[in-house]
């Protein structure tokens, strides 16, 4: 199951809720968040905490971490969680489901947090704990029938069996789980680690200089030079103006407006 926690309310003063603990009285057992002590629920937080969650044969009794994604790659299941702001992260497992009797795991969130666990039936899983900021930048994709989790501030586009990443920055960084084996972009620099790859691309900036003509007091004409879309996928026109409304037209057809 899942516990939903929110510390947000419109039109009200919000503040961190400190020294919080939650106890669930279930049929035949009691589950506490956290197992010992207390946590802080940050203001504006919306949190989902799991209990009695089956991780492919390993029973996660409780966690002060929010589930994010599960990918399957090379036949292995890889689970991703992230740490809500203000909460000390912990995983509590049912000892009789984990080989070696691991009961409690206190991770340090980040790209190097991946751990390997094996169930008593021999099934092996990976668990990675991310920060909230990293989770917000995560995107699940499929490449050559293998699932991957990409973490990047850029736009990620799934195009059939390929993935395209685009950004307005000249330096683009991506962290990929699991570690990648092949990238078609020759300018990529790859730092391969045990469970992930850190990939960076450096591209030359593209500079477009449009011609702008003032047709009237409230109307401007913008002409793009020939070849403006060479080496780019999109051009973004940003206009600062003072007024109630604005509208943009291409060949007489309105393509954007602003109120």
How should these model regions be labeled?
Residues 1-259:
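Non-catalytic C-terminal accessory domains or segments of carbohydrate-active enzymes
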């Amino acid at each position: 199951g899942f516990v939903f926690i929110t510390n947000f309310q419109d039109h009200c003063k919000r503040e961190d809720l400190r020294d919080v603990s939650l106890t669930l009285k279930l049929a035949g057992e009691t589950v506490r968040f956290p197992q010992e002590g207390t946590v802080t629920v940050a203001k504006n937080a919306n949190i989902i905490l799991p209990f009695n969650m089956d991780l492919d044969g390993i029973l996660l009794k409780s966690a002060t971490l929010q589930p994010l994604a599960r990918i399957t790659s090379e036949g292995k299941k890889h689970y991703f969680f992230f740490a809500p702001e203000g909460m000390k992260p912990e995983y509590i497992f049912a000892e009789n489901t984990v080989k070696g009797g691991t009961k409690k795991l206190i991770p340090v969130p980040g790209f190097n947090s991946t751990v390997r666990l094996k169930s008593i039936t021999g099934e092996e899983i990976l668990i990675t704990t991310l920060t909230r900021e990293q989770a917000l930048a995560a995107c699940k994709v499929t490449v050559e029938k293998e699932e991957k989790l990409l973490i990047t501030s850029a736009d990620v586009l799934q195009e059939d069996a390929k993935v395209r990443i685009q950004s307005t920055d000249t330096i683009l960084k991506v962290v990929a789980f699991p570690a990648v084996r092949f990238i078609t972009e020759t300018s990529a620099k790859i730092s391969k680690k045990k469970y992930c790859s850190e990939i960076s691309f450096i591209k030359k900036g593209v500079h477009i200089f449009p011609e702008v003509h003032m047709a009237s007091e409230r109307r401007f004409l913008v002409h793009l030079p020939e070849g403006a879309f060479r080496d780019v996928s999109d051009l973004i026109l940003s206009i600062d103006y003072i007024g109630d409304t604005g509208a943009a037209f291409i060949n007489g057809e309105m393509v954007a407006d602003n109120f």
